[in-house]
Amino acid sequence: MADGGRAVMDRDQMISLVERHLKAEGAGDVEGAVAVYTDDVEHDVVGWPTGPLRGKDAAREFYRHLTANFRTEDERPQHRYFAGDAMVLDQMMTGTVTGSMLGMPGNGRQITFRVLHVFEFADGLISRENVWLDGGAIQQQLA
């Protein structure tokens, strides 16, 4: 036990939970993507117009927008780092922009870009997700 008596998840549990989240997101399964979140989750895609979001309902709206505009086709982890109840995932993502992304029309183009996620966990669920996208690579491929 750590952090005031809360059980710390092990690495395999963290990886499994994040993979469930990403698989659901990639399949366009909004409910599955948020099912692994705590009710008071903080979801922050740095630079996204909405700013940080709080709670499952707000995250659900984000994923509805994302899955309506982007279809994930491949995710390749580059590195994973662990510290206490946190995991950093550095990955390459490939998908098709079916609508728009970062305010730019996708016109059905396939793009590949780097993504850095910082996940925090509480009570066996994801309590925080911060995401940094390689906006320059996205814009260059959509221009």
Regions found by a protein language model. Give the residues of each.
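C-terminal and inter-domain tail/linker signature
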Residues: 2-143
